[in-house]
Amino acid sequence: VAESPFKSAWGEFTLRVYRSLPDGRQHLVFTLGQPDETPTLVRVQRENMLGDLFKGSAFGAGASLASSFEAVAKAGHGVIVHVAQPFGGMQADQDGVRLGQMDARDYGIGAQILSHLGLRRIRLITNNPRKVVGLGGYGLEIVEQVPF
């Protein structure tokens, strides 16, 4: 794990980079404040190069990432996990270019990182009301889903 201050438009975060041993992908983790007993505001987001970096309107235009930083800054403490994806999260074939889907392995990576940070009870930033299962095995509990 590498760590460094990260000044952003939303304030000064701490940036940690976790490297996945099986595939070498490097996952970015932005934290604001220190975890405590209160539930922590968390966003786990898959890499979306065309939306996050190039603001492609058909690819989410980075809105969820910016909204997540805004929400964490407003709350005063929280965590954003940016899960790296092969090919920047894109799938390209004869049918065109589209975003790949986040799968169970990506949730597992995010959960391992959150557990390593010492989080237990989280307020998950999401617009997807479906229940995320399997986090209990990492000692995590979603106490609230927060739309952005």
Which residue ranges define each predicted feature?
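Catalytic domains of riboflavin
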Residues: 1-148
